[in-house]
Amino acid sequence: MITQTELDNCLQWAQNNGAFIDPKISFRITEDAGVSAFVNEKFSPKPDQALIRVPETLLITSQQALSEFSQAANERSLLNSVTQLYLSKLKFGTDAVHLKSFYKPYLDVLPLHLPQPYFWSTDEVMNLHGTDVYLTMRDTLNKLVKEWRMLFQALSIEHSSQDKQFLSLFQENKDSAVVPLEQFCAHINGCKLEDSEWNSFVAYLWSYCIFNSRAFPRVILGRAGTDRTNLNEGFLYPIVDLLNHKNDVPVRWEMNEQNELCFMSQTTTFSAQDELFNNYGNISNEKCLLNYGFWDSSNKFDFSRLTLKLPSTLVSGLPVDFNKSGNFVTDDGETTILQFSLKISEPLPPVLLALFAYLSKLKSEETPTVRSVLEGIDQLTSVVSQRLLFYKNFKIKTSSTQKLRPHVIKLIKLYYQDNKKILNATTEKLSVLQKKIYSNNKEFSLSFKTIFKNDKIFANSLLLVFGAINYEDLITKDCLNDALLLWIVKLINDKSNNQGGFIKQTFKEVSDSIVIEKEDVMEFLPFYKKYFPNLSERIPEIYSVGDWGIRQFIVADTAIDRLVWIRKSNKEPIFLMKKAYDLQI
């Protein structure tokens, strides 16, 4: 941690070079948050009142970086990388580096040892294995190495000797290969930042993390020639970047006519000793952890990410624009990857429900039906529950050679705990929604369990057929589907039974349109031979009345697909009248 003297030197340096810090603000070092800014007395700043003004000459931008790396002037796409490399050279290079002596008081307050997970021990990082943060870290580091190597090649810079073995990991693999996170951890942990050279990967990673936690978008400078579409190009804003980040805090940054970048808090009133915060944008806890190294369980912008891999042909046929909804990630022609953010405030995004409703829709259905939505909820619940189980089963793991730091253990536990909380909210929302949809459509449904209880003659026949004394026996003996098929054909053959009119109608629609192939008959032959003609002879009062041919069962099987939803809680088949469901997306 930096010292109060280093902090005071930085503040004095800024003020000596034209910066203004309102006298009502003081900076000090705290045990929990490091450098923090506090308001000394109660006051109400005006919306356009600059509490901090910093001359443009104190900012670290791509302009200074190009003074050091002039050959990068034509590499517009690498400007942010060049600025980060310049910071590495300022921090870890020799005193001869352009402007190093000028920026020294500021560089001294940039912490050498950072709290971000990229600098955790291997054992600490391995406790994130299987999480979204783990995958994000792996992908970020692989992307960062690619960017770093490309930058060095463009600028004709030699890599540090300490990276020789590390670089071999990427020279042996193709560009598309992904180097495991464990190998990154081993290299990063094996490098001491205080002894590292400016052209080492760990120095570049340090600079990347400094930018992630402190940089401001260059577009706010309002300079001519600034690519306003490139929001990734950042710069460092001394003094203001000492303010801690907090979501929901209203702030403004604006360049004035004197080329001073002004910080204006939009908080209406401060009490004495209130902390003065900056806001880099309302961000999730995942970004708080990766960018700043902290976690806030009260963060209303937090989410748990649900990632789905689906066949591309399946997704392309859906009437949902996942690009527009922001859920599309990649598509390699075979597999489409979609991601959904689940939040406590919105545990079930409408587009996610729509996706599973469409995935559960039959080809014969033009739009999702009540049945397909209920079935889609079951499938989605299964996916979310599987993810939830992963978080529930988590236990801290460590090897005998490494000790986990208490504050890191706390962060890891909070990560699992809060993801578990969000996923629990999603499963509860799905359960409540499913019950509501079923309740609203109960008058258009027919429970097979109720049928079994009321149709004594049919139920008694199943005692002879399956040895099923009660409904539960049909489940335990794994003959529920066979019983369904037998009952549907019985219903169709019983002309005097007015029950299940919508079932009879669907059966007729299927019977009139179905084309039965030889393969269909062969598939049903074992089932048919298992029961007929035996049932016709043993229980003729049911199984000899009407048409009990194999075709009837093939038609009944398709009718089941269109009408039956199996309630997961008790494996109860429920017939649902075909009825469109408005997804409202």
Curated annotation (Swiss-Prot):
Matches recorded under InterPro entries: Efm1/Rkm1 (IPR017119), Set10/Efm1_SET (IPR044432), SET_dom (IPR001214), SET_dom_sf (IPR046341), SETD3_SETD6_MTase (IPR050600)
Keywords: Cytoplasm, Methyltransferase, S-adenosyl-L-methionine, Transferase
Superkingdom: Eukaryota
Enzyme class at the top of the EC tree: transferase
Family note: Belongs to the class V-like SAM-binding methyltransferase superfamily. RKM1 family.
Other information: Present with 5170 molecules/cell in log phase SD medium.
Task performed by this protein: S-adenosyl-L-methionine-dependent protein-lysine N-methyltransferase that monomethylates elongation factor 1-alpha (TEF1/TEF2) at 'Lys-30'.
Protein's name in the database: Protein-lysine N-methyltransferase EFM1
